[in-house]
Structure formats: structure tokens, C-alpha cells
């Protein structure tokens, strides 16, 4: 009696992970199988191996038919006992697989919950991504207001500078006037000095004239005294002459008349000299008085002019001091305004830089979250593919069992196999276990690809906005080109793998067309059970 095992129906990774039971070898079947590929890389290996098992089993069943007819009842009983033990082991293995599959379903539910959480986080991130644009609009409005304020301050500064220039022009005019007044003051002081010098000279001349007048008065007094003495002498001479005349009356009778004539002549001469001296003195005194009056008027005018110049100089000095104080105050105010504007501009620039840094960090954080979400989607896709591979393994095992039940010819063996195939494994043919292995990964693959495309579009939109906000450097441009090339290479590799999988699926479909004709009835029953299971699952979900 030839022995057989279930080793060809499982992949190498599946056997290594889950199937650790003892093996029952079939030497006639082991040669038709090879090690299956990993469940993460491809999920078509179990189906191909199961198809090859079906072919080999169908070929071996033909050779076993004559031998089974010649078996006696003891051999049939031994075979049935072996089959019962094998089926017991298979039942235990399938229960273990059911438990593992239930754990995988729970894991899928957990991943779906995580997917919902990630979708909520993505929605929050998108909202945050929309919020920075709103903040950016607010900040741009604030920046525009600040720029308008800076322009107003600049205009005010220009107006103050114009006013300052006007004040500087006024100051220059006042300085020119001050210099002119200083020159006029110096001229007036020069004229005053000349007037003082003239006044001193006039005073000296007056003193000299007064001295001369005194000397002339003394001379006049002396001349009067001399004249009086001469008159006295003349009178004495006249008296002496009268006496001599009286003595010589008889000889000189005309002497008195001569003396009278002489006396009259001298009196006339003295009166004339006196008159001439008085006239000369009066004329000289008048001239000196007039010159002194003229000098006094000039001195008075010079004094008045000097006092007026001093008053004007004092007024202009006060005005210049006031202008200087005003200029210093305006310069101080202008400096304070410039310092304040510079401080405001620096504070605004710091605020702008801080907001730009926050926006940049928010964008980078959002890109990191999107990348993590994409990585989680990739992990989810890998887990979905692994689950689909395990589902295909289960379906291949069920089809193998159905072929085993069909291949047995004896009535007892066929009845037991039919009962075992319908009753013991009816729980495995529910909708959750008998979903189409070809449609399940295609659905999840398309769903995950749609999510990945959405994530990639979001990342590209984020990168485009960052590129609009900040011009990329040469290193960043090269990195983006490298990333694009890597993405294109990965897409090409994925397309090649998808094409290979499609070609393998097509080959499997072509090879399984002959066998599917034999199992149409079982497939129709499975479809009915699948529809019923789907309805139950939909009700559970609702």
C-alpha cells in the first residue's frame, strides 16, 4: 500500500511557520512538486502546486483503480483506518488553520481600525495643511499692513527730512545774516573807534583851545594891565605936561589940544584893538563850540548805533540759539523715529522668519506623517496579500480533498469521503473562507493602489507648494530628480511583477479549465454558500 502526504499542497514558508505535524510520504507523488515561492512575493504558488497535485493525483488514481478492486476487506479496513487517522490529523490541522485564519481576520479588523485612525490623522493633517494657508493669508495681510506702516513712516521721515532741510536753509540764512551783522558790527565798532578817536582829538583840541583861551584871557588881562599902566603913565605924563604947560603957559598955549588929540588917538586904537581881540576870541570860541557840538553829535550817534547793534546782535544770538535748540530737538526726534522704525522692522522680520520656520516645520511634519501613512499602507497591502495567499492555500486544500473524495471508487470509501467533505469541512466553506482568491487580492490591491495614489498626490501637492514658497536649491533639485527616477523604476518593477502575475494567472486559468469542468457542481454550491456568507457578513457589518 502506497503512502501519501500533504506536503506538496503547502508552500515552504507556510510549512515552516504553521505546519509542524509529522509527514506521511507518498513516493509516487513527491516527484511532481517543487518548493513554492514566499507568500509575500507572490500568492500564485499554492494554486499552481495544487493544480500539479491534481494532475499527479488524477494520474495516480488511474493506476490505483485496479489495485483497489483486488483489495480484500482487511486491506479496505486498514486503508479506512489510515484514512480516518489522516483525516483526524487533517481536521486538527484545519482547525489550527481556522484558528490562525480567525486571528488573521482579527488582525485585518485591527488593521482596518488602524487604517481608519490613520485616515482620521490624514484628515487632521489635511486640515492642518489647509490651516497654514489660512495663517499664511493672515500673516501676509499683517505683513502688508506692516509694510504700509513702514511706508507711512518712510514718508513721514521724508517729510521730516524736508522740514529739516528747510530749517537748515533757514539756519544758513540766519547764519549769513549773523555774519553780515557781525561784519556790520565790526564796521560800526571801527567807526565808533574812529568817532571815539575823533572825540578824543576834539577833546584835546578843545582843551588846547581852552588853554589858549585862558592864555589869551591872561594876555588880554595883561594887555589891559599894560594898557592901564600906559594910560596911567600917559595920564602922569599928561599931568606932568599940564604942570609943565601951566608953568609954560605963556610959551606953549596949544599943548593941551595936542594931548587931547593924542589921547583920543590912543583911546581909539585901544578900543579898536579891544574890539578886534573880542571878535577874534568870539569867532574862535564859536568855531570851537561848533566843532565840539559836531563831535558830541557824532559820539552820540555812534553810541546809539553801537547800542542798536548790540541789541540786534543779542536778538539774533537768541534767535540762533532757539533755531539750534529746535534743530537739535528735531534731530533727536528723527533719530528716535529711525531707531523705533528699525526696531519695529527687525521685530517684524523676526516674526516673519519665525512664521516661515513654523510653516516649513509643519510641512515637513506633514510630509513625514504622509510617508508613515504610505509605509503603513504598504504593510497593510503585504498583510492582505499574505492573507489572500493563505486563503488560496485553504481553497487548494479543499479542492484537493474534493478531488480525493471523487477519486475513491469504493462505495464505503466514497460515502465516507462524501460525508467528510460535506459535513466535517462545511464550516470552512463559508463566505469568509471561500472568497475568490483571485478577486480578493485584486480588490485590496486596487484599493491600496488608490490610497497610495491619493497619498502620492497629496505629497506631490505639498512638495509643489513648498517649491512655490521656496526656490529649491541645486542639491534639492538633484534629490527630487533621483526620487522621481527611483519612483519610475519602482513603478516599472511593479508593472512587470503585475504583468508576470497576470501571465501566471492566465496560465493557471488555461491549465485549470479542464479540471474546472469536473468541479462545476461543487463550484456552484460554493458560490451559493459564498453568497449566503456574504449576506451574513453584510448583516454583521450593518
From Swiss-Prot:
This protein's UniProt keywords: Acetylation, Cell projection, Coiled coil, Cytoplasm, Cytoskeleton, Glycoprotein, Intermediate filament, Methylation, Phosphoprotein, Ubl conjugation
Organism lineage string: Eukaryota, Metazoa, Chordata, Craniata, Vertebrata
Residues glycosylated per entry: 21, 27
Chain segments carrying region Linker 2: 273-281
Composition bias type Basic and acidic residues, residue spans: 460-471, 528-542
Region (Tail, subdomain B (acidic)): 445-542
Protein name: Neurofilament light polypeptide
Domain notes: The extra mass and high charge density that distinguish the neurofilament proteins from all other intermediate filament proteins are due to the tailpiece extensions. This region may form a charged scaffolding structure suitable for interaction with other neuronal components or ions.
Other remarks in the entry: NF-L is the most abundant of the three neurofilament proteins and, like the other nonepithelial intermediate filament proteins, it can form homomeric 10-nm filaments.
Residues modified to Asymmetric dimethylarginine: 23
PROSITE patterns: IF_ROD_1 (PS00226), IF_ROD_2 (PS51842)
Residue numbers spanned by region Coil 1A: 94-125
Chain intervals with Acidic residues compositional bias: 472-527
Annotated organism of origin: Rattus norvegicus
Gene3D superfamilies recorded: 1.20.5.170, Single helix bin, Vasodilator-stimulated phosphoprotein
Record region (Coil 1B): 139-234
Annotated segments matching region Tail: 398-542
Chain intervals for the UniProt region annotation (Tail, subdomain A): 398-444
Gene that specifies this protein: Nefl
Residue ranges of the region described as Linker 12: 235-253
Amino acid at each position: 500500500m502506497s503512502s501519501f502526504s500533504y506536503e506538496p499542497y503547502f508552500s515552504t514558508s507556510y510549512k515552516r511557520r504553521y505546519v509542524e505535524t509529522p509527514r506521511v510520504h507518498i513516493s509516487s507523488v513527491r516527484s511532481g512538486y517543487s518548493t513554492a515561492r514566499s507568500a509575500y512575493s507572490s500568492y500564485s504558488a499554492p494554486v499552481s502546486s495544487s493544480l500539479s497535485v491534481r494532475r499527479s493525483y488524477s494520474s495516480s488514481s488511474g493506476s490505483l483503480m485496479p489495485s483497489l478492486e483486488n483489495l480484500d476487506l482487511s486491506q479496505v479496513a486498514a486503508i479506512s483506518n489510515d484514512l480516518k487517522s489522516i483525516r483526524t490529523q487533517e481536521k486538527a490541522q484545519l482547525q489550527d488553520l481556522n484558528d490562525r485564519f480567525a486571528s488573521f481576520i482579527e488582525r485585518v479588523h485591527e488593521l482596518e481600525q488602524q487604517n481608519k485612525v490613520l485616515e482620521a490623522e490624514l484628515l487632521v493633517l489635511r486640515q492642518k495643511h489647509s490651516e497654514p494657508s489660512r495663517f499664511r493669508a493672515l500673516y501676509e495681510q499683517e505683513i502688508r499692513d506692516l509694510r504700509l506702516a513702514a511706508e507711512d513712516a518712510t514718508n513721514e521721515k521724508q517729510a521730516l527730512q524736508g522740514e529739516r532741510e528747510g530749517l537748515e536753509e533757514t539756519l544758513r540764512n540766519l547764519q549769513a545774516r549773523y555774519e553780515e551783522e557781525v561784519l556790520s558790527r565790526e564796521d560800526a565798532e571801527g567807526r565808533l573807534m574812529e568817532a571815539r578817536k575823533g572825540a578824543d582829538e576834539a577833546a584835546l583840541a578843545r582843551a588846547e583851545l581852552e588853554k589858549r583861551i585862558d592864555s589869551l584871557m591872561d594876555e588880554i588881562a595883561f594887555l589891559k594891565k599894560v594898557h592901564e599902566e600906559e594910560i596911567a603913565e600917559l595920564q602922569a605924563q599928561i599931568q606932568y605936561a599940564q604942570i609943565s604947560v601951566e608953568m609954560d603957559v605963556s610959551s606953549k598955549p596949544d599943548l593941551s589940544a595936542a594931548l587931547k588929540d593924542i589921547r583920543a588917538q590912543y583911546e581909539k586904537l585901544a578900543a579898536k584893538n579891544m574890539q578886534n581881540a573880542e571878535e577874534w576870541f568870539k569867532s574862535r570860541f564859536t568855531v570851537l563850540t561848533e566843532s565840539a557840538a559836531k563831535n558830541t553829535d557824532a559820539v552820540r550817534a555812534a553810541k546809539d548805533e553801537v547800542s542798536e547793534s548790540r541789541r540786534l546782535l543779542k536778538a539774533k544770538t537768541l534767535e540762533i540759539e532757539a533755531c539750534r535748540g529746535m534743530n537739535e530737538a528735531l534731530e533727536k526726534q528723527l533719530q528716535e523715529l529711525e531707531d523705533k522704525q528699525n526696531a519695529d522692522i527687525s521685530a517684524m522680520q523676526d516674526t516673519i522668519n519665525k512664521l516661515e520656520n513654523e510653516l516649513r516645520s509643519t510641512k515637513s511634519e506633514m510630509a513625514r506623517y504622509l510617508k508613515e501613512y504610505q509605509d503603513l499602507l504598504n504593510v497593510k497591502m503585504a498583510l492582505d496579500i499574505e492573507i489572500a495567499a493563505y486563503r488560496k492555500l485553504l481553497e487548494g486544500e479543499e479542492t484537493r480533498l474534493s478531488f480525493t473524495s471523487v477519486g475513491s471508487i469504493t462505495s464505503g470509501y466514497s460515502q465516507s469521503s462524501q460525508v467528510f467533505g460535506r459535513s466535517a469541512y462545511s464550516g470552512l466553506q463559508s463566505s469568509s473562507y471561500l472568497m475568490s482568491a483571485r478577486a480578493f487580492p485584486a480588490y485590496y490591491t486596487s484599493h491600496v493602489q488608490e490610497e497610495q495614489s491619493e497619498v502620492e498626490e497629496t505629497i506631490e501637492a505639498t512638495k509643489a507648494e513648498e517649491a512655490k514658497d521656496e526656490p529649491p536649491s541645486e542639491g534639492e533639485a538633484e534629490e527630487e530628480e533621483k526620487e522621481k527616477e527611483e519612483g519610475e523604476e519602482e513603478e516599472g518593477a511593479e508593472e512587470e511583477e503585475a504583468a508576470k502575475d497576470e501571465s501566471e494567472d492566465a496560465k493557471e486559468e488555461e491549465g485549470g479549465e479542464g479540471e474546472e469542468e469536473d468541479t462545476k457542481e461543487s463550484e456552484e454550491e460554493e458560490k451559493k454558500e459564498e453568497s449566503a456568507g456574504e449576506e451574513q457578513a453584510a448583516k454583521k457589518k450593518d
